[in-house]
Amino acid sequence: MKTSILVLAGAALVGIIGAALHISARDGATWSRGRALYDANCAACHGGNLEGQPNWQSPGADGQLPAPPHDATGHTWHHSDADLIAYITLGGAEALAQMGVTYDSGMPGYGNQLNAEEIADILDYIKSRWPERERRYQAERTASDGGQ
């Protein structure tokens, strides 16, 4: 009986370790894709370290706000996944218009350049850079917004 318990415990441990390695490999691949896509499509405005543009909370001469940071000092983590996906896909002005807000945002839409999986990879990369508190808050916002 002791042998059976040890065999079952060993099998369970191997399964858990295997699942953890699979998840880590998947997350590592997602992170790498997300980082590469962020660098190619977002970093020029939002910064290579997610730092955003200087004075991002004050409109420029054109009336538009500079690109905000996507790190914990910004407000990206205040929004649900659905809102972030809409903003990236449609662009700022159109996404805001669909929420009933009129604002000439400088954020272009990437729906014609990036597919849904690529946008998700970018968001996963951005989220991976946040402290636990911000990730938890954003996950709660997403859950309260229907899980998207």
Positions of PLM-derived features:
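Histidine (H) residue identity feature
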Residues: 22, 33, 46, 70, ...
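Periplasmic/extracellular electron-transfer cofactor-ligation site
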Residues: 29-30, 35-66, 90-101, 128-137
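N-terminal Sec-pathway targeting helices
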Residues: 1-10
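Electrostatic cytochrome c docking/interface patches
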Residues: 14-38, 136-148
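Extracytoplasmic electron-transfer domains, predominantly the class I c-type cytochrome c fold
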Residues: 59-128
